[in-house]
Amino acid sequence: MTKSELVAQLAARFPQLVLKDADFAVKTMLDAMSEALANGHRIEIRGFGSFGLNRRPSRVGRNPKSGEKVLVPEKYVPHFKPGKELRERVDRRAGEPLKAEEPDDDL
């Protein structure tokens, strides 16, 4: 699902929201989540999962073109850990064929 599909589904589910307002709501939520992670905070959405940061220590890498050793600096990368309810829901549906065309009404 893309961001535009999420906006369209939100607008369809809540008819009082025009597409522009649904787009603003999704962008605002994603901006708030991005800002929280950028500031080193953890995000927890009960039943869905949590977003956090994992530290990747510095290491010596190799330039694939020249074979030269290069120092790859330490960095933090976003990490998602699914919650129990989400894992169970996905597991129940794992045996069913994927339906990319139909939106999930349970969201």
Swiss-Prot record:
GO terms for cellular component: chromosome; cytosol. Gene3D superfamilies: IHF-like DNA-binding proteins. The keyword Hydrolase does not apply. SMART domains: BHL. The keyword Cytoplasm does not apply. Signal peptide: none annotated. Keywords: DNA recombination, DNA-binding, Transcription, Transcription regulation, Translation regulation. This protein is one of the two subunits of integration host factor, a specific DNA-binding protein that functions in genetic recombination as well as in transcriptional and translational control. This is Integration host factor subunit beta. It comes from Paraburkholderia phytofirmans (strain DSM 17436 / LMG 22146 / PsJN).
